A protein has these predicted regions:
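A well-structured
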Residues: 1-163, 465, 490-499
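C-terminal, non-catalytic "cap/extension" segments appended to globular domains
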Residues: 2-4, 20-23, 36, 40, ...
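Divalent metal-coordination and catalytic microenvironments
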Residues: 8, 148, 264, 297, ...
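Contiguous, non-catalytic segments that form substrate-binding/exosite surfaces or channel walls
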Residues: 107-257, 451
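Inter-helical turn/loop segments and adjacent helix faces that build the functional surface
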Residues: 119-127, 164, 187-196, 276-283, ...
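All-alpha helical catalytic cores of prenyl diphosphate-utilizing isoprenoid enzymes
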Residues: 174, 178, 205-209, 215, ...
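Active-site recognition of the HExxH zinc-binding catalytic motif
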Residues: 257-276, 294-298
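Post-HExxH zinc-binding segment in Zn-dependent metallohydrolases
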Residues: 286-326
């Protein structure tokens, strides 16, 4: 190992330690921090973010990156370390253009905006959140202009969350999917609806937490390097190598919400936990492709978790932990988790209509950054698009524009990744069945860990060594297409609804 590489790794360790402190503070803010501690913790977030920013834009760091980019050094590095140097040099050059005071203000404002969103959602009042959102939008535009002054802001944001992706490709794939979804939804809407009255009862939230532990263990989440807590909005975060955490939210009148949030977040966490240890402390362990990440969470949640055969080996175990389910026939539960109908809340939408929720958000984000729609006009635009795409209109802001936290922390460009992930899943399904055989049989026999192992070997262990297009080509041998997902929907729901 060269002296330059040793110096770089020592420097990188300092940056990672700041990132760990910031991640831990955010975890605490979302899960346990008392109300009166919020401003102090936000101040700490600002401090650590500023120190991290200073380190990541220091001339010493840039000098190390440039030395390691020289052929005599670069050619001696591992592929993962080469990726680290390329990506970090790119980010260094971008961040070097951002004034330190602006960066500190931006980070602090996003954290403050998250708390304003929580208050606005609780009050179902967009006006409480609007000034914060307006400022985050404005500062996000400024943030991008500092880094890449000649690039379209929204194009940059999409690429930030899904490396190598562009809006032209997304427009094409989403149009392909939308063309197939709308007539399928019409056929489902015309079919008889199942009787789900057995689920109209109260389910103990504490017992739901035990069910979550059962499900996480069943699909392969390791509690030796993971933890679970409660938050307003379920999420997954990696604090450091060997520490991947998930949260959930529990509703007494809707246990299916926490069940599938557990499986969804578990899919995210398993991906992070399964990254090869040789990649720790490199850019490969920092999975920066959210579509690829969402493909894992949504594969577990939908392709596996909504398959009736997934539940055959564990339904009785779940009922023992959550006794109310003993009064819910297995067939009724299966119909409930595959019930398709337009709904207000994205995170509770079925897998068919979910894509339309994402298309709505994608179109609004493009309107924000390309059409300069006014922040105060966003609730009306949201409601208009809900009616156009799903045929329903929110009764209030909480079940409308305030339902997601993403915009509060500046995560514009993230939403398309959810639907991209589902599109990738249709392709994974076909590849898995070629290697492991019929999925129904694998699940019926309780071989869920065989699937987790397949995903680990094909996808998880590489982290972000390859972008999503490269992963699809390596795993599936094809370019990205929505057709496999549409075939999956058509085959599955023609059986469920008998058309």
């Amino acid at each position: 190992m060269s002296q330059t590489l040793e110096q770089f790794q020592a420097y990188q360790t300092r940056l990672e330690q700041y990132d760990q402190a910031i991640a831990l503070l955010y975890w605490d803010l979302q899960t346990a921090a008392p109300k009166d501690s919020i401003e102090a913790k936000l101040s700490a977030v600002g401090y650590f973010s500023t120190e991290s920013f200073r380190l990541s834009t220091a001339d010493e760091y840039g000098s190390l990156l440039k030395k390691l980019s020289a052929p005599e050094e670069y050619d001696q590095l591992s592929p993962a370390m080469q990726l680290t140097i390329r990506r970090n040099l790119r980010d260094f050059e971008r961040f070097k253009r951002i004034p330190e005071a602006f960066y500190t203000e931006y980070v602090t404002e996003k954290a403050r905006s998250e708390k304003a969103w929580e208050a606005a959602k609780e009050a179902s009042d967009f006006s409480v959140f609007a000034p914060h959102l307006d400022k985050v939008i404005s500062m996000t535009k400024e943030y991008v202009h500092y880094m890449e002054p000649d690039q379209d802001v929204y194009e940059f944001l999409v690429g930030l969350f899904e490396d190598g992706m562009d809006t032209e490709t997304i427009d094409r794939i989403f149009a392909e999917l939308k063309e197939g979804l709308l007539p399928l939804l019409a056929k489902i809407e015309a079919a008889p609806k199942p009787d789900l009255s057995a689920l109209q009862q109260t389910f103990d939230p504490d017992a739901q937490k035990k069910v979550q532990e059962l499900l996480l263990s069943y699909i392969g989440f390791s509690f030796d390097c993971g933890a679970v807590a409660e938050s307003m909005h379920p999420f997954t975060t990696t604090l450091c190598p060997g520490d991947v955490r998930v949260t959930n939210h529990y509703y007494a009148d809707n246990p299916i919400s926490s069940i599938f949030s557990a499986i969804h977040e578990g899919g995210h966490a398993i991906f992070e936990q399964n990254v090869d240890k040789d990649f720790w402390h490199t850019a490969a362990a920092q999975i920066n492709m959210m579509g690829l990440h969402e493909s894992q969470s949504r594969f577990y949640e939908n392709i596996l978790g909504r398959n009736p055969h997934f539940w055959t080996p564990i339904y009785e175990k779940m009922s023992a932990l959550l006794p109310e389910f003993k009064t819910v026939p297995f067939d009724t539960f299966i119909k409930a988790i595959n019930d398709v109908h337009p709904s207000m809340i994205r995170t509770e939408a079925d897998e068919v209509t979910y894509g339309l929720h994402i298309i709505l958000r994608y179109e609004i984000e493009k309107a924000i950054f390309r059409d300069n729609v006014k922040t105060d006009d966003l609730p009306a635009l949201w409601n208009q698009k809900m009616q156009e795409l799903l045929g329903i209109t929110p009764a209030n802001d909480a079940e409308g524009i305030l339902q997601d936290m993403h915009w509060s922390d500046g995560s514009f460009g993230y939403f398309p990744s959810y639907l991209l992930g589902s599109i990738y899943d249709g392709m994974y399904l076909e590849a898995i069945q070629k290697d492991l055989g019929d999925l129904d049989t694998v699940l019926e026999n309780g071989r869920i860990l065989d699937i987790t192992h397949w995903l680990k070997e094909k996808i998880h262990r590489f982290g972000s060594m390859y972008n999503s297009k490269e992963v699809i080509e390596r795993v599936c041998g094809k370019e990205i297409s929505a057709q496999p997902l549409l075939r999956y929907f058509e085959e599955k729901y023609s059986k469920v609804y008998g058309f």
